[in-house]
Amino acid sequence: MVAKNIKYNEEARKKIQKGVKTLAEAVKVTLGPKGRHVVIDKSFGSPQVTKDGVTVAKEVELADKHENMGAQMVKEVASKTADKAGDGTTTATVLAEAIYTEGLRNVTAGANPMDLKRGIDKAVKVVVDQVKKISKPVQHHKEIAQVATISANNDAEIGNLIAEAMEKVGKNGSITVEEAKGFETVLDVVEGMNFNRGYLSSYFATNPETQECVLEDALVLIYDKKISGIKDFLPVLQQVAESGRPLLIIAEDIEGEALATLVVNRIRGGFRVCAVKAPGFGDRRKAMLEDIAILTGGQLISEELGMKLENANLAMLGKAKKVIVSKEDTTIVEGMGEKEALEARCESIKKQIEDSSSDYDKEKLQERLAKLSGGVAVIRVGAATEIEMKEKKDRVDDAQHATIAAVEEGILPGGGTALIRCIPTLEAFLPMLTNEDEQIGARIVLKALSAPLKQIAANAGKEGAIIFQQVMSRSANEGYDALRDAYTDMLEAGILDPAKVTRSALESAASVAGLLLTTEALIAEIPEEKPAAAPAMPGAGMDY
């Protein structure tokens, strides 16, 4: 077993403090509209330029193992806030440092760390309840654009694109961010259900120019096994041909005689048909086929349910107003399924998202929900250079998450103002704490609430304490607009923060800072000293 180096008491706390401070100093320079960029060296390719707190935090690794423990714990604050709310990672880091620094001062002065933590937790609950009270729901397209603009470092173009995307796909819709090939940042919206499986033969294409197969008022056959022979398949094909409507076939695969028959039918000018492979794999494929069946009002023909392809009839087929199939993907527009069944399916998927512990599963479930309920919007980020594109993509990601958080839990006056407005409520709560050290813990949170505002002011070249006093003396929604160096009504000026982001930042910061305050010993491996390399043998160069 490797020997360990153990630090205790004051020495341990100083090491943690140094690690916390080192990480926080790198992260907090990015806060606010006048926050700076951080350039991160990469082992390959060009350096990364970012203003995203969690991206900076993830890159910090300190040489001293004990200091690194403190840094890694605060890194956890940024990561947890990003996981919960998708934004607010810099605010969370600033709050964590403020709570820990002030808490450490009191522990050194003799306060009981466990009582301090209890006081911190109680104070945070009071502030979170107040944040929920003062938040207001997002009601207009304009407010979504304002939240996105603030989160994208005051880039109105990004804000408007995200608001437009949210409006088009709805709150259950999916917004994905990709890199564009050109300089422009554009929005593409795919209406209806889209999945990345194209036609199995180019002979199915109805438009030679676009190489797409477009089926109007189509029937949809959904089967969960391979179709290779024509015998089992023929009865339903004859019924469809008699109906005179085009047919989309979705199956695990269509090959051999079955595919050849369909292709020959198209070449000879028979009824319009197109065959595609089913999307997804394994259990996820079955779930997606069931989604398509509900969307189109058809049935999934599955042998597991005792159904056979040879017994399929028109009543089992789904219906859609339009189907567009390209070489790469398929889009079903206006499926004619029952509204109640569709809503029930969406609710079932939402429940699965809540119950799932895997980020990957959640993402896939969210995609399914979006395809069923709203549609998919793709924001393609363009820029002059790759470095600029990556930095812009980070900001679009932040803005997207901020808008989703705003829709979920409402909005607050931004620029650190909302936390300042919680100070009077917390002051009124202090006398209710009878334990002196718990009261000190609550006061630590009270002092920390002004830290984000002070940091925004400092990054704008102003004295944080003076700005704080000015904001405290003003009415509810008035705060400091660092971009214009003015005091204004933050809601009217469109300087908004999502309530979920503010809440998550405070909860994550207090949780980790409280744990650090109650730490009394640090254990780390002693780094092995590698022996110096042996000197080269004389004359080894053979130059004599």
From Swiss-Prot:
In which residues is ATP bound?
30-33, 51, 87-91, 415, 481-483, 497
Family stated for the protein in its record: Belongs to the chaperonin (HSP60) family.
Gene3D superfamilies to which the protein is assigned, alphabetical: GroEL, GroEL-like equatorial domain, TCP-1-like chaperonin intermediate domain
Q: Does the keyword Repeat apply?
A: no
Q: Which Pfam families match?
A: Cpn60_TCP1 (PF00118)
Q: Which reaction does it catalyse?
A: ATP + H2O + a folded polypeptide = ADP + phosphate + an unfolded polypeptide
Q: Which UniProt keyword terms apply here?
A: ATP-binding, Chaperone, Cytoplasm, Isomerase, Nucleotide-binding
Query: What does the UniProt record say this protein does?
Result: Together with its co-chaperonin GroES, plays an essential role in assisting protein folding. The GroEL-GroES system forms a nano-cage that allows encapsulation of the non-native substrate proteins and provides a physical environment optimized to promote and accelerate protein folding.
Task: Please provide, in alphabetical order, the Gene Ontology terms of the cellular component aspect for this entry.
Answer: cytoplasm
The subunit structure is: Forms a cylinder of 14 subunits composed of two heptameric rings stacked back-to-back. Interacts with the co-chaperonin GroES.
**Biological process annotations from GO:** protein refolding
Q: Which InterPro entries match?
A: Chaperonin_Cpn60_CS, Cpn60/GroEL, Cpn60/GroEL/TCP-1, GroEL-like_apical_dom_sf, GROEL-like_equatorial_sf, TCP-1-like_intermed_sf
What is the name of this protein? Chaperonin GroEL
Species of origin: Chlamydia trachomatis serovar L2 (strain ATCC VR-902B / DSM 19102 / 434/Bu)
